[in-house]
């Protein structure tokens, strides 16, 4: 860790008491800043608040007093807090610099950074990259950080110059970077998402592309080549472009040909040997292969990871098999593209559990994926009726409306047959009923476990 002096004696306001906010506050205090943390909510568990206060950090909860902006030099913002927030907009009006926590991580670390962004596939790709970089490694370590759960500023304090920090970065986080400079940037894909936060699709794309804004010709930009828009976006980076393509549209990086995974001229392994299901996971694997090859990893290291890695929690996660029905938790599928790709990964008939927050979309786009594959749907949440309409148009035989992803489980089992896949892949955010997609997925798994126990008792 570099003990930089730029924050010594500065007044910093950390907005938001989440993991990243707490770690940023502690780090800034260590760097000599005068730190105040503010959150509009007062947490029921005061453990973190007391920890911060014990380190000499002022904590103010319950509201956003405007006087907190007086004489501050910097705001470190929780990425989920919108720029329309009264303190954030006030800071902008005053010309106060606003950053997010990954920026701090970059500033204090000598490690190499790999930044991964995109609409879908970020977490799985980030995890695959770290596993490949660590496979067979005798010197240096790859850390996973960022939007995946471990704050980058926490990891950055441990990592050395021999290490690599593989950081999953959301569009929200990328809006708050100014100097963050990844040796390798990865763009998995870009679809329409978070328009409620960014206002327009163009703003969303621009936020994502901030990941390359500080790259030079000595860096690498790994980009999905299967879409013309994404190809064009690669021109925004000064770095060396390394494409990956499931459709074989470029052979200059990682791609699929004849049922095999390749890197340039190098045949690595059969596509069918990837353990995690789904065409989307083929794309994730290709992105990870490209990064692994940039860092000189062997085919054997790559094969070991792809043939053993069973997936990330809430991303087409296998839960259990119950009387010939396989249950999968894909709660992370918060948009239609993610659900389309999840469905494409299964050959067996599917009972689909879907629905959630209404963001103003209709679901006609899902209909081709539902046809001839989904024989039953259990729909729930604010979009239940819209989801049911798409199912009806696609010719789905049975459509049942229920309260949520928990009550959907026994209903799904009732309409399923031996050999079916029962898939939670909502195509919607969880916020109408659950605080996060992780909570939704965990509740789904608990409901499956409860159903298993009930059936065993009969």
UniProtKB/Swiss-Prot annotation:
Catalytic reactions on record: UDP-N-acetyl-alpha-D-muramoyl-L-alanine + D-glutamate + ATP = UDP-N-acetyl-alpha-D-muramoyl-L-alanyl-D-glutamate + ADP + phosphate + H(+)
UniProt-annotated location(s): Cytoplasm
GO molecular function annotation: ATP binding; tetrahydrofolylpolyglutamate synthase activity; UDP-N-acetylmuramoylalanine-D-glutamate ligase activity
UniProt keywords, alphabetically: ATP-binding, Cell cycle, Cell division, Cell shape, Cell wall biogenesis/degradation, Cytoplasm, Ligase, Nucleotide-binding, Peptidoglycan synthesis
Keyword Disulfide bond: no
Top-level class of the enzyme under EC nomenclature: ligase
Domain of life (superkingdom): Bacteria
Annotated ATP binding sites: 118-124
The protein's annotated pathway: Cell wall biogenesis; peptidoglycan biosynthesis
The keyword Transmembrane helix is annotated on this UniProt entry: no
EC code: 6.3.2.9
GO CC term, one of those recorded: cytoplasm
GO biological process, one term: cell division
Major location category of this protein: cytoplasm
Pfam families (UniProt xref): AlaDh_PNT_C, Mur_ligase_C, Mur_ligase_M, MurD-like_N
Protein family (similarity comment): Belongs to the MurCDEF family.
Role this protein plays: Cell wall formation. Catalyzes the addition of glutamate to the nucleotide precursor UDP-N-acetylmuramoyl-L-alanine (UMA).
Protein name: UDP-N-acetylmuramoylalanine--D-glutamate ligase
Lineage summary: Bacteria, Bacillati, Bacillota, Bacilli, Lactobacillales
């Amino acid at each position: 860790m570099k003990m930089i002096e730029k924050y010594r004696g500065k007044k910093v306001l950390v907005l938001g008491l989440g993991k990243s906010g707490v770690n940023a506050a502690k780090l800034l205090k260590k760097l000599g800043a005068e730190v105040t943390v503010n959150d509009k909510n007062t947490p029921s568990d005061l453990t973190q608040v007391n920890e911060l206060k014990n380190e000499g950090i002022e904590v103010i909860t319950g509201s956003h007093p405007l006087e907190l902006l007086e004489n501050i030099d910097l705001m470190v913002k929780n990425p989920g807090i919108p720029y329309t927030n009264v303190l954030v907009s006030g800071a902008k009006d005053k010309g106060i610099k606003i950053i997010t926590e990954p920026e701090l991580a970059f500033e204090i670390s000598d490690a190499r950074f790999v930044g991964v962004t995109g609409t879908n596939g970020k977490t799985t790709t980030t995890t695959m990259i770290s596993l490949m970089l660590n496979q067979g490694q005798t010197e240096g370590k790859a850390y996973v950080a960022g939007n995946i759960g471990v704050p980058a500023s926490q990891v950055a304090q441990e990592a050395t110059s021999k290490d690599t920090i593989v950081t999953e970065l959301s569009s929200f986080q990328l809006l708050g970077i100014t100097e963050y400079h990844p040796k390798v940037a990865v763009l998995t894909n870009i679809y329409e998402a978070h328009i409620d936060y960014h206002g327009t699709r163009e703003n969303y794309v621009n936020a994502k592309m901030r990941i390359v804004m500080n790259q030079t010709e000595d860096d690498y930009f790994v980009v999905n080549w299967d879409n013309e828009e994404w190809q064009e976006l690669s021109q925004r980076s000064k770095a060396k472009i390394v494409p990956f393509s499931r459709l074989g549209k470029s052979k200059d990086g990682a791609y699929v040909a004849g049922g095999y995974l390749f890197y340039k001229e190098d045949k690595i392994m059969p596509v069918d040997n990837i353990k995690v299901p789904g065409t989307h996971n083929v794309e994730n694997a290709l992105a990870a292969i490209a990064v692994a090859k940039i860092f000189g990893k062997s085919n054997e290291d790559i094969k070991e990871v792809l043939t053993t890695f069973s997936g990330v929690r809430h991303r087409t996660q296998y839960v259990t098999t119950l009387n010939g029905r396989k249950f999968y938790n894909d709660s992370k599928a918060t948009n239609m593209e993610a659900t389309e790709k999840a469905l494409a990964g299964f050959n067996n008939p599917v009972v689909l559990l879907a629905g959630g927050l209404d963001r103003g979309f209709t679901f006609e786009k899902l209909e081709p994926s539902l046809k001839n594959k989904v024989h039953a749907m259990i729909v729930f949440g604010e979009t239940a009726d819209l989801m049911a309409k798409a199912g009806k148009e696609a010719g789905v035989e049975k459509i049942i409306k229920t309260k949520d992803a928990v009550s959907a489980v026994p209903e799904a089992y009732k309409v399923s047959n031996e050999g079916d896949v029962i898939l939670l892949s909502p195509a919607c955010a969880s916020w109408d009923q659950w605080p996060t997609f992780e909570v939704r997925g965990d509740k789904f798994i608990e409901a499956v476990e409860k159903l298993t126990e009930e059936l065993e008792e009969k």
